[in-house]
Amino acid sequence: MQISIRNFAFAPVDITVQAGATITVMNEDSTAHTLTASDKSFDTGTIDAGKSSTFKAPAKSGSYPYACTIHPFMHGTLTVS
C-alpha cells in the first residue's frame, strides 16, 4: 500500500488497510513532510523531498487520524480493518 505526498496533500487522503500492513509514504513534493498519527501509534519521521518512508499499520482495528507535523493543515485518516 502506498500514500503519496504532492502539492501539500496526501493521496489518497483516507485509506483502509489490514492490521499490520506495510505502508510506504512517497514524498513527491518539493519540501519535507511527516505522516504522524494523532495518537502517535505511527510516525514516518521527517521525509525529505523525493524520499520515502515505510511504517506498519497498527494491530488494533479502528480509525487513526493523521497529519503532517510540519504542515498541520495536511491530514487524513488511516482505517485498520
Where does each model-flagged region fall?
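Extracytoplasmic copper-binding redox domains, predominantly the cupredoxin/blue-copper superfamily
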Residues: 1-81
